[in-house]
Amino acid sequence: MSKQSFYPVILAGGSGTRFWPRSRRRQAKQILALDGKQTMIQKTMERLLPLGTEKDFWVITNEFLAGEIQRQLPAIPPRQVVVEPDARNTAPAIGLAGFLLERTAPDSIIGMFPADHVIADEKKFRKVLQRAIEIAGREDHIVVMGVQPARAETGYGYIETGDKMETELFRVKRFTEKPNQQRAEEFVTAGNYYWNSGIFVWSARTLTRALREHLSETTPYLEQIAAAWGT
């Protein structure tokens, strides 16, 4: 698969409340340099560049962060920094990106990446991501990256895996949002649960088809926005 066919979409619309007081609405953690060097969104883009090209990146953010993100990531075309007029959680942001790319690059593979991840082994991460891209390209699959839980964490969502398809590749049985402590401990003990990383990979067509099926009330509005984008 060529680099040009993979489009990373960085989700950077957080309000900055969970990292308060260091993080604020206009200084959310994704635009902060917590290590004193690169900001989290800069690290996210750098981590993904071996698999994509700068001109193929998209960012979904809000009006308070858009200007600073464009300053920090000047290589991304301004029209590809999408500003949400109102925060409506993740699904509409992902949906808008999907419909925009369906129009501009219908054969593309799309990856959705939170802007605030810390990943220690980036080489291994890219290896797993490359495999996800290949699977999404050859199959009509939505691929989600799971993380082996290190503890019974109540702050993350969990993925319950079902049948094994290939080495380290499983069907998803169900998603569970942030559980209480008891359930989190049960998940870790069971051995077939993973933390939900929030990283998804799919073809543009697979994504938009799923949106039309499962987000039917919102989809027409997203399609209208995508059709008018850049006009």
Predicted regions and their residues:
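A structural signal for short, well-ordered beta-strand segments and their strand-loop junctions
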Residues: M112, V144-G146, N196, V201
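A short acidic, often aromatic-flanked loop/helix-cap motif at beta-alpha or helix-coil junctions
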Residues: A87-P92, R151-E153, Q181-R183
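Structural signal for hydrophobic packing residues in well-ordered secondary-structure cores
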Residues: M45, L49-G52, L73, A105, ...
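Basic phosphate/pyrophosphate-binding loop/patch that engages nucleotide-derived ligands
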Residues: E122-T167
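Catalytic core of tubulin tyrosine ligase-like
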Residues: Y156-T231
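Conserved N-terminal catalytic core of the sugar/cofactor nucleotidyltransferase
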Residues: M1-I10, T17-R25, A33-P114, V118-R126, ...
